[in-house]
């Protein structure tokens, strides 16, 4: 199958790198580091508040910072980084073109928009439900919408990874079995699909319910 995919050869490792995959790896890795820094900042605020001599934030801002810290450190940065690893372990290590790069960019866009929406909603107050957001804690509908969009984008990234493995197999870009790192990434992607999909499915009725409640309160 002929394609217009552009490659370069890494001067250090000698690996053949799909330029489209390289860009996706970079943007996902950068987004991961940015949200790790944001989450770390919120974590510092939480730590300074827990320090009795400082006690930086009042109670409402403490739980706001704790919620943002949990989301960015335990969810957003980890999954952005996982997407970068998945694209590296498939396209780069197997010397393959990435499957459906437009879908991969769409997934990244959804993840970025979702993460930004959730962070903004948390900073606006009224959504300090912490990372677990257990009942009866209730957040604004945008909080759940942002997480759902982020989850859908991550699922798209996982399926692009699976597709890239298929492309590499069909085009015989590697010999024998897949490398151990790629096998580990495959295992992580399978686990991610089940966990992310189940989380998103649970949040969809929650988002719809709270959106309906918000509409009733405003009417």
Regions found by a protein language model. Give the residues of each.
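N-terminal signal-anchor module of multipass membrane proteins
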Residues: 10-72, 76
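Membrane-interfacial loop-to-helix junctions in multi-pass inner-membrane proteins
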Residues: 16-33, 93-113, 136-147, 166-191
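Conserved small/polar residues in nucleotide/adenosyl-binding loops
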Residues: 210-217
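Hydrophobic positions within alpha-helical membrane elements
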Residues: 74-75, 194, 218
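Alpha-helical transmembrane segments and their membrane-interface junctions
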Residues: 125-126, 196-209
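Short, intrinsically disordered terminal tails adjacent to the first/last structured region
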Residues: 1-9
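Alpha-helical transmembrane segments of integral membrane proteins, especially early/N-terminal helices
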Residues: 27-43, 69, 103-121, 192-200
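Membrane-interface helix-loop-helix modules in multi-pass inner-membrane proteins
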Residues: 47-52, 57-58, 62-162, 206
């Amino acid at each position: 199958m002929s394609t217009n995919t552009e490659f370069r050869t890494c001067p250090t490792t000698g690996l053949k790198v799909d330029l489209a995959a390289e860009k996706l790896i970079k943007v996902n890795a950068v987004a991961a580091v940015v949200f790790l820094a944001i989450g770390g900042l919120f974590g510092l605020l939480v730590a300074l508040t827990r320090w009795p001599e400082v006690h930086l934030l009042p109670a409402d801002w403490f739980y706001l910072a704790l919620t943002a810290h949990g989301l960015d450190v335990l969810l957003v940065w980890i999954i952005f980084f996982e997407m970068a690893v998945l694209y590296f372990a498939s396209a780069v290590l197997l010397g393959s073109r990435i499957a459906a790069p437009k879908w991969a960019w769409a997934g990244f866009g959804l993840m970025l928009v979702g993460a930004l929406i959730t962070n903004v909603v948390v900073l606006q107050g009224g959504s300090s439900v912490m990372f677990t957001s257990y009942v009866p804690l209730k957040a604004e509908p945008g909080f759940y919408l942002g997480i759902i969009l982020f989850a859908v984008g991550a699922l798209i990234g996982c399926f692009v990874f699976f597709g890239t493995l298929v492309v590499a197999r069909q085009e015989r870009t590697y010999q024998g079995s897949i490398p151990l790192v790629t096998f580990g990434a495959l295992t992580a992607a399978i686990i991610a699909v089940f966990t992310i999909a189940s989380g998103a499915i649970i949040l969809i009725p929650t988002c719809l319910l709270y959106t309906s409640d918000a509409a009733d309160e405003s009417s």
